[in-house]
Amino acid sequence: MEINKFLAVVVAVVVLYSVEATAQGGNPQLTACLQKLLPCQPYIHSLNPPPPPSCCGPMKEIVEKDAPCLCIAFNNPEVLKALNLTKENALLLPKACGVNPDVSLCSKIATPSPIASPGSTNGTSSASTISFNRFSFLSAFVAMIFF
């Protein structure tokens, strides 16, 4: 059982670093969106067992109230590649949660280009933000797995 927890942590860290590297392109909306969907991480590639309410609740909320959030990830080939997903595979998880996102909205919603952070004289501002984001992702996954 302990080896399963260890493997889950390793997989989570690899996925987080992959997604974080993509999100570091400067899109804070994408980072916030992906944080809401952290409970869905174990179900990205396997829907057996079906995703629990802890995954489906945030998924339904995002589909119903924040379509641009999903569109940012759905329209970003780098995010899909980092998660080893195709657009078709990405739609399986919401469907497993009983929601059908209207992906036609994604073609109408302009996904924001990466937002450049304001320049700083010594450059430390951006680095500390990136470190904090990576730490918050990792902390959330570790807490989710062990508690």
From Swiss-Prot:
Keywords: Cell membrane, Disulfide bond, Glycoprotein, GPI-anchor, Lipoprotein, Membrane, Signal
Tissues expressing this chain: Expressed in ovules.
Membrane topology according to the record: Lipid-anchor; GPI-anchor
Main location: membrane
Keyword DNA-binding belongs to the record: no
Transmembrane segments annotated in the record for this chain: none
Disulfide links within the chain: 33-71, 40-55, 56-97, 69-106
Propeptide: 126-147
Top-level taxon of the source organism: Eukaryota
Signal sequence residues: 1-23
InterPro entries: Bifun_inhib/LTP/seed_sf (IPR036312), Bifunc_inhib/LTP/seed_store (IPR016140), LTSS (IPR043325)
Record function comment: Probable lipid transfer protein.
Protein family membership: Belongs to the plant LTP family.
Protein name as annotated: Non-specific lipid transfer protein GPI-anchored 9
Underlying gene: LTPG9
